[in-house]
Amino acid sequence: MRRTLFILALAAVVAVAAGATALGATHVSTVDPTGFSARVDNPWFPLQPGTTYVYTGTKDGKPARDVLQVTHRTATIDGAPCVVVKDRLYLSGRLEERTTDWYTQDRKGNVWYFGEQTSSALDKSGKPVTTGTWKAGVDGAKPGIYMFANPRVGQQAQQEFYKGQAEDHFQVLSLRSPVTVPYVSSKNALLTKEWTPLEPGVLDHKLYVRGIGTVLEEAVKGGTERLALVSVHRGA
């Protein structure tokens, strides 16, 4: 019951945030853990099990390669069934970070982010750095909307919340943004901006192509990261 009430409250907060834009009246969604599915087929962020996305570019001034794999595994996080996504980031050919992400979708088609388990380069004591790791329902961590079912310009939401560790937000900027990456070109990409109060002055843009998902991520302020989609392999 605690989980259900919490997610209802969070949905209301997200709805109010979206309604506070020029889109019109606010509304409250009545979602709960039983209303989620590990089948994520939102056209702007589809997560079909067996699919592998490969991105290349630069990060922190180094050649970067990011491999994102949608597994056939599911996990129950704070009562909600989530698809398990593995993410491996290589810098200058060396594995820099491993991340396990948990996503789920509500009945309306919104994609929710329920947490991540992160392990990056070793610290001075030889232990892997796990900063940014969080799981909905643990130690006050809360899930957030990662992608709207029907994105509209001006919509915004908090994607995650674990105080002092994970506080990303995003806002829809355009539904007709041109983009060209090695894998695809489109004149109707979805453009968003992302930011976090934990890194003031840092702003990222992401572009999504319908039916594919994320095709480009780049820092536009306070960073040098740029990762573009180069291949998509859809396995069994």
Predicted regions and their residues:
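Bacterial N-terminal signal peptides that target proteins for export
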Residues: M1-A9
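Bacterial N-terminal signal peptides
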Residues: L8-A18
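C-terminal region of N-terminal signal peptides and the immediate post-cleavage residues
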Residues: V16-T26
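Conserved functional acidic sites
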Residues: A25-A236
